From Swiss-Prot:
The lineage of its organism: Eukaryota, Fungi, Dikarya, Ascomycota, Saccharomycotina. Keywords: Calcium, Calcium/phospholipid-binding, Cell membrane, Coiled coil, Endoplasmic reticulum, Lipid transport, Lipid-binding, Membrane, Metal-binding, Phosphoprotein, Repeat, Transmembrane, Transmembrane helix, Transport. Belongs to the tricalbin family. The C-terminal C2 domain shows Ca(2+)-dependent phospholipid binding. It binds to phosphatidylserine, phosphatidylinositol and various phosphoinositides. The other C2 domains do not retain all 5 conserved Asp residues found in calcium-binding C2 domains. It comes from Saccharomyces cerevisiae (strain ATCC 204508 / S288c) (Baker's yeast). GO terms for cellular component: cellular bud; cortical endoplasmic reticulum; endoplasmic reticulum; endoplasmic reticulum membrane; mitochondrion; plasma membrane. This is Tricalbin-3.
Length: 1545
């Protein structure tokens, strides 16, 4: 059968069919609008090529006739279809047909809802109604009618209103023609249940039950009369009616009475105590039988233990001679139940008693024959035959009390999760103790010694109180106990079978050796394969396998059996030899590499086997154990700083474990509900199920016959190479006689499933229908090296922009203290970003934007809010989950994902607590979906080019065949015809055009997109370090590696959202901790251009080498399909270069008519710059330069505040002026003359240079707060920058020098970007040291321009040892020199750098100070950073072994940046040999003050005798001081003596 190709349009009757369907559904629409739509519709061709095939009549006559008839029928329908009749333009809607008229607008010139004005109907609401024209139409009539013609504007208005609604809303396919998802056209089971319930409720209950008796009576009366019976026959009819009515009435009363009784019992159950006579009767009879057995069991179990614990000192042995609890059984006095405790909880109060001495409830015979409880402890005194056993008796034991029992149900058998026990009151405990004398002469010391009984009771209550007395309770986790007894996997054993040598097969004739290895364990994990086999090697005695098999083990106290078999085609496989390995050796050495052992059969050697064993245990969750340890440490009074270090270590471990993607999944399939039964003819199913992981079947569930809601409750454990990428597929079949039919399927990743189940949802939805109840638990495993799962590049489907505006924290948190909230962003429970915390506020304003790449519509974004705690674990505030499927959807036409809403709307979401209960806390967020264009990778592009060539050849062959058929048709036209077929190349073209084909040059033209980075291999230096990758100005790492094994990096994947590719940078950081929180944690750091990395590592992997570390990386790039706004590009962030020139006509603030003006520059209420002070002038000239970091031009506000300096008291405000930076052009220089809001103006010059500001530390526990940020990339990170990055503490600062100086100067003022220079233009020593610490060494590994820094490795800081390291820093408040009018108006720049010390003669004047001389000195405590929240500085002077306290500052509270400003000064007298001792005290209001540490400064050090400030490490932070020592009263430096001439030669 052959044919030719032709292009045709769709048949015209198809459009008419859709229009007819619209008419049927939308009958309430104006007919005029429908007709106009029909006349104006354009039946354009679909754009696809249709194929007409030429069919030979002789070959297929029947098909030809059918096709011809169909074509002619379609043409006749199209020709005969008349155009719809035009309706009069006078047709309108009238008010009587409108619905919800109370929501329609009031009267207006275009028509209204009534003839009576609203002022007349509701005069109170329209006392001041605006004037308007009278109604144009009288719409008070109650039936349709034509009142007036509609104008063109009215018709156009009606058309526009109706065209606003899309076809999907007006004509939903569910109402037009619903079809079954399986394609069988059967109705939905859920809909069938609804219809059945409606029929039973309305037709049966309401109609049949109410009128059936009446209709029956009437029918039989007519029947009897028709037959000819007399009226006496009515007696029998009414008798039957009465019988039926009585039965119905009795049934109705019985059911109603039963329902009312149930409701009453449930409501009164918690108000009364139930008696348990039946239980007590059972216990009294059972106790007599069981008590002797219990007594003997206690003696048999306890006496062997007591035999070996004799204390000595004359006591030879201990033993229980007699143990009985008496003949009276314990009783339950009553049970009180609480019915409203929750869905899965039962709570009861049990009143119990064990009182054998009470005979009030016993008969006379029982009281006479009763046996009292008695415990006799025999103590043997002496040795050998000179010994005597003395009994110690405990008698008359009585216990009674009231206990609350709370049972929480679970999902796993026995369906009890936790049992909580709590004593509601101290129990009654009474007994008699006879230590001496036995039964005859024994004396009860409990009643003889006064106060002893109450003392013993108090000891008992004090011990059980913390466990059982309210509010404490003892929790027994039944699930954990059952899990501990079950044989769960504790790890994975990787068995590598390398090879075998000299294998000896059987002596059978023509036998060849075809070996394979079978691995078995003694105790296999339930649900796993008992045998694991290697491949078969044919006809070889020295096979080479090099295969690795993974075995799940539940214990290492077993043996591994390795058997080598010889494969036989017909005969049974024969055993060549076997080998047993003791796995207990892996406890000491988890790696047994390159092992060799003999395969033996009996005592004969059958060959040599080479193998390797690697043991990977499960990472234990020690959170509960560590919580108990913290509680014990707190009870023992451990130091707070130790607890804080422990908490930080636990957080690092938790963050590290969250990155592990390999592990063991424990999957329990419980049951499936609401399966589709319409495919079954009988309505009953015989379901079975199959579970697949990454396409491999791992479990087959048994078939359950004739059950529509199967319940398996079977568990399997399986090794999953990637929790996020592995595909989980569950298929449920109906096992029929003719085979299995698929009735339900569910497919997702394990990460998505676990996230869904963690949201308090017990099931997942299958397709087409079915609720699948699953339990999935995860156990992480660290598999490194060659055993780590190779990462695969997952295709993203888009990116979600998450904007967190602000939050309102309500409700009480556990603990005492201020609320310092911050939030984290998680994707499928993996933390991607942590924001900064906002100090002491319940309404934090974050204004942060987060970009999160999305790879599955089942992923869930989670926002968690915490309260930052300086000491201890952060407190949980609440969380909210945002399913990604609510943000975007899949376009059915293009197959691409698009956003649900075009506009960005702010949503108010309420937070939920740990129990998923809604709280009063609110967060305002908005989400936007950014679609992407999938691009073929270089490897895929090669395969696509091959497919294109093959497709081109297929089309040529097809066209050639069509030409031949066309020629045959011209010769024999009666034997051929044109038939329409589907495009035979459509599937191939869709496969080729699934992604875009872009070259590297075309790809890098796209500014924004998702960068996929593959780390293939690598090593870190040192081997114990971690690798972090930061992007652009994002402070939180976009990638954190798993813990390397001996410094070797695992193969991992990272996805980063890039906002501007041309300016983007990647920062590779090697740190000591999992996440570096301080500069001391950084070992080395290197920066690369993202664009250069992409160019060099796009087609082939490349090696990166920096600071002893190296790694092999590969990059891919997926661009976005929409252009990001300028506010999200690099043009929105950068540095504002400001030159503060002068001020004119400023306000006078001093008595002399002048002011001492200086300027503060604020960015979002944060001071970033402070100018010099100009004395006694209203027209100051500053000529100072400042480099101001701007994190977001669209969100930041720059304010210039002019102040008048006062020596005493607060500075006076001279006015403010704001600068709009959002409208500045990049690189253009502007001249501004800003008018102050009071008087005068300031003259500025500046320009804006876009640049990503390099991220700093302290994301959560730092001091940068209340700043608008951008957060981006796969780990959603925040742009955090300090107000200056050019200066920091010098190398002399002990630990943390890289961060502290620059951080503190930001808040104190000064130009942080300048370096002090000497008069000849070279950097001074202090500035040079600072630049060495902060600046970066330029290196070019792999021919790339990179920037690296290697901070100094500092020792651990001990606050009890005085710190003698300090360094000079740039002055925050520079020395003010007397100036006159000429100097103030000169063009000379008066900058802080000009006041910095340089290489001058004064820099070494300390040599002129006389030894043991006394000099005056002044010390100014400027500020402290990250020392404590409430800090106080104590200054002392030490000399000659004596310590003298000279000053103590006021207690200052640190601001949001962690900076406490003092500006306090004191004087002292001392010799150069003396030392200044600076101590920090943490001021506590509710507890004792805490010493944070001390620092020591030698007054003879030349560094302190130069102008400037000094930074010293104090506690966990830094202290900035200024020392003026050794100068005269005029502040002049003593002259430097001349150097002798003999030393100058």
């Amino acid at each position: 059968m052959t044919g030719i190709k032709a292009q045709v349009h769709p048949p015209p009757d198809s459009t008419l069919f859709h229009e007819e369907e619209k008419k049927k559904v939308g009958g309430n629409l104006p007919q005029k609008v429908i007709n106009q739509q029909e006349r104006g519709s354009d039946h354009a061709p679909s754009g696809h090529h249709q194929y007409h095939q030429l069919i030979n009549h002789d070959a297929n006559d029947t098909k030809t006739s059918n096709s011809v008839s169909d074509v002619s029928k379609g043409q006749k329908t199209a020709d005969s279809n008349p155009e719809g009749k035009k309706q009069s333009s006078k047709d309108i809607f009238v008010a009587s047909s409108a619905q919800k008229t109370n929501q329609l607008p009031g009267p207006n010139p275009q028509g209204s809802i009534g003839a009576v004005p609203l002022e007349g109907l509701r005069p109170k609401e329209f006392r001041s109604a605006p004037s308007r024209k009278p109604n144009k139409f009288d719409t008070s009539i109650t039936k349709p009618g034509v009142l007036d013609d509609l104008g063109k504007l009215d018709e156009k208005d009606i058309k526009e209103k109706f065209h606003l609604d899309s076809d999907d809303k007006l004509f939903p396919w569910q109402n037009v023609g619903e079809f079954h998802a399986s394609g069988k056209g059967s109705p939905n089971t859920k809909m069938s249940r609804v219809i059945k319930a409606y029929i039973l409720e309305n037709f049966y209950n309401d109609w049949y039950c109410n009128i059936a008796t009446v209709l029956g009576t009437c029918f039989f009366s007519w029947l009897f009369a028709y037959i000819g019976f007399s009226w006496w026959s009515m007696i029998f009819i009414f008798l039957g009616t009465a019988t039926v009515y009585n039965a119905e009435y009795t049934r109705f009363n019985r059911n109603i009475r039963d329902d009312l009784k149930r409701v009453t019992v449930e409501e009164t159950l918690s108000d009364r105590v139930e008696s348990t006579t039946w239980l007590n009767s059972f216990l009294s009879k059972f106790w007599v039988i069981y008590m002797p057995v219990l007594s003997q069991q206690v003696k048999d179990n306890v006496n062997p233990q007591l035999a070996g614990v004799a204390p000595g000192y004359g006591i030879d042995a201990l033993a229980i001679d007699e143990f009985t609890l008496g003949s009276k059984a314990p009783t339950i006095k009553g049970i009180k139940s609480y019915t409203k405790t929750g869905k899965n909880t039962v709570e009861m109060d049990w009143s119990f008693a064990f009182t054998p001495s009470d005979v009030s409830d016993m008969t006379a015979t029982e009281a006479r024959e009763k046996i009292n409880p008695k415990i006799s402890l025999g103590v043997t005194l002496g040795k050998s035959f000179v010994s005597k056993t003395m009994p110690i008796l405990v008698e008359d034991i009585n216990v009674a009390g009231k206990m609350r029992i709370k049972v929480e149900f679970g999902k796993a058998f026995p369906n009890i999760k936790i049992v909580s026990l709590q004593l509601l009151e101290p129990p009654l405990i009474d007994f008699a103790l006879k230590p001496i004398g036995g039964d005859t002469l024994g004396l009860d010391v409990m009643s003889f010694l006064p106060g002893l009984k109450s003392f013993v009771k108090n000891i008992i209550n004090s011990n059980i109180g913390p466990m059982l007395f309210p509010p404490n309770h003892l929790d027994i986790n039944v699930e954990d106990i059952m899990a501990a007894q079950s044989k769960e996997a504790i790890g994975v054993l990787a068995v590598t079978i390398a090879s075998a040598d000299s294998l000896k097969g059987s002596d059978f004739i023509t036998n060849t050796v075809d070996p394979y290895i079978v691995m078995t364990t003694e105790d296999a994990v339930p649900g796993t394969d008992e045998e694991v086999r290697t491949s078969i090697k044919s006809n070889v005695k020295n096979p080479r396998w090099n295969e690795t098999k993974y075995l799940l083990l539940n214990t290492l106290e077993q043996k591994l059996n390795l058997k080598c078999f010889d494969f036989n085609d017909v005969r049974k496989d024969t055993v060549i030899g076997d080998l047993q390995l003791d796995l207990a050796d892996l406890l000491q050495n988890p790696v047994l590499d390159n092992q060799t052992a003999e395969l033996r059969s009996g005592t004969k050697s059958k060959g040599i086997l080479h193998y390797s064993l690697h043991w990977f245990p499960v990472k234990e969750d020690k959170s509960e154990e560590k919580a108990v340890e913290r509680a014990e440490a707190k009870a023992k009074g451990k130091k707070e700083d130790e607890n804080e270090d422990t908490t930080e270590k636990e957080e690092d471990e938790n963050e590290e474990s969250s990155q592990t993607d390999v592990g063991i999944a424990k999957i329990t399939l419980q049951k499936v509900k609401y399966l589709d039964t319409t495919s079954s003819m009988t309505g009953s199913l015989s379901p079975c199920a199959e579970l697949f992981i990454d396409g491999q079947k791992v479990k087959s569930y048994r078939t359950l016959r004739r059950i529509n809601e199967p319940s398996w409750n079977e568990t399997i454990e399986v090794l999953v190479p990637s929790k996020s990428n592995s595909k989980f597929v569950l298929k449920i079949f109906d096992d029929r006689m003719n085979g299995k039919a698929l009735i339900c399927e569910y497919s997702s990743s394990l990460d998505d499933i676990m996230t869904t189940l963690d949201t308090a949802q017990e099931f997942v939805k299958g397709s087409p229908q079915g609720d699948i109840y699953l339990d999935v638990s995860w156990k992480s495993i660290e598999m490194t090296g060659a055993f780590a799962a190779a990462n695969s590049v997952s295709e993203p489907i888009g990116c979600i922009k998450l904007d967190v505006k602000d939050a309102i924290i309500k409700g009480d948190l556990s603990g005492v203290g201020d609320v310092d909230p911050y939030y984290t962003v998680s994707l499928n429970r993996r933390v991607l970003y942590k924001s900064i915390y906002h100090s002491d506020t319940d309404h934090p304003i974050f204004d942060n934007s987060t970009y999160v790449p999305i790879f599955s519509p089942n992923q869930i974004l989670t926002l968690e809010f915490h309260d930052y705690q300086k000491i201890g674990k952060d407190r949980f505030i609440g969380s909210v989950q945002i399913p990604t499927s609510n943000v975007f959807k899949k376009d059915p036409k293009s197959g691409k994902y698009v956003g649900n809403n075009g506009k960005e709307e702010i949503s108010k979401l309420k937070l939920k607590d740990h129990e998923h209960k809604v709280t009063e806390s609110i967060v305002n967020v908005s989400t936007t979906f950014i679609p992407i264009n999938l691009v073929y990778s270089p490897e895929e592009l090669v395969n696509v080019e091959k497919l294109e060539k093959e497709l081109k050849e297929k089309k040529k062959k097809f066209e050639a065949t069509q030409e031949e058929n066309e020629q045959e048709m011209e010769k024999n036209p009666k034997e051929w015809e044109v038939a329409e077929i589907e495009d035979p190349f459509d599937s191939d073209e869709k496969k080729i055009n699934r992604k875009a084909k872009l070259s590297l040059n075309e790809l890098i033209k796209q500014k924004s997109g998702i960068l996929s980075m593959q780390i293939l291999e690598g090593t870190l230096s040192p081997s114990s370090a971690y690798l972090e990758i930061l992007a652009d100005d994002i402070s939180y790492p976009v990638f954190i590696c798993m813990k390397p094994s001996q410094g070797k990096l695992n193969s991992e994947m990272a996805n980063i959202f890039i906002r501007d590719l041309n300016y983007s940078k990647l920062h590779f950081r090697v740190s000591k901790k999992h996440i570096a929180k301080d500069s001391d944690d950084v070992i080395s750091e290197t920066s690369y251009s993202t664009l250069k990395l992409l160019k060099q590592a796009y087609e082939e992997p490349m090696w990166l080498n920096f600071n002893g570390s190296k790694m092999k990386v590969r990059f891919l790039y997926t661009p976005t399909s929409v252009k990001l706004p300028s506010s999200e590009s690099v043009e929105d962030t950068g540095y504002l270069n400001i030159k503060l020139i002068s001020g004119h006509g400023l306000k006078s603030a001093d008595r002399n008519g002048y002011s001492d003006p200086f300027v503060h520059i604020f960015v979002n209420d944060k001071k970033v710059f402070k100018s010099n002070i100009k004395k006694k002038t209203l027209d100051p000239v500053w000529n100072e330069d400042a480099k101001i970091p701007i994190l977001s031009r669209s969100k930041n506000q720059v304010i210039f505040n002019v102040l008048d300096w006062d020596r005493a008291g607060d500075n006076d405000d001279l006015g403010q002026a704001s600068l709009d930076v959002s409208s500045l052009e990049v690189g253009k220089t502007y001249n501004w003359n800003l008018n102050l809001n009071t008087q005068g103006s300031i003259k500025l010059q500046g320009s804006f240079n876009p640049e990503y500001i390099k991220p700093s530390f302290d994301i959560v526990k730092g001091g940068i707060t209340d700043k608008p940020m951008k957060i981006a990339s796969g780990a959603a990170h925040a742009t955090v920058g300090i107000a200056g990055t050019g200066i920091g503490a010098a190398t002399g600062v002990a630990t943390g020098g890289l961060k502290k100086g620059g951080h503190l100067l930001k808040s104190l003022g000064g130009n942080p970007m300048k370096r002090s220079k000497s008069s000849n233009g070279n950097e001074s020593n202090g500035a040079k040291k600072s630049s060495e610490k902060k600046s970066f060494d330029r290196r070019s590994p792999s021919n790339l321009n990179s920037t690296s820094v290697t901070p100094r490795a500092s020792l651990d800081y001990d606050p009890s040892v005085p710190n003698t390291s300090y360094a000079p820093v740039q002055s925050a408040s520079p020395v003010v020199k007397p100036t006159d009018n000429t100097s103030s108006s000169s063009n000379k720049k008066d900058t802080p750098s000009s006041n910095s010390r340089g290489h001058s003669r004064a820099s070494s004047f300390a040599r002129t100070l006389a030894p043991h001389g006394t000099y005056n000195g002044f010390i100014t405590v400027v500020a402290a950073e990250n020392v404590a929240k409430h800090v106080q500085i104590k200054i002392s002077l030490t000399q000659g072994g004596r310590l003298k306290h000279i000053y103590k500052t006021k207690s200052q509270k640190a601001n949001n940046d962690g900076v406490a400003v003092f500006d306090e000064e004191c004087s002292f007298k001392a010799s150069p040999e003396a030392n200044l001792v600076l101590g920090a005290i943490s001021h506590q209001r509710l507890s004792r003050d805490k010493d944070l540490g001390i620092a020591q400064i030698n007054l003879g050090d030349p560094q302190i005798q130069q102008d400037g400030q000094i930074s010293v490490k104090l506690g966990d932070g830094h202290l900035i001081v200024k020392i003026n020592y050794g100068k005269d009263k005029n502040g002049q430096v003593p002259p430097v003596p001349e150097v002798p001439q003999e030393y100058t030669q």
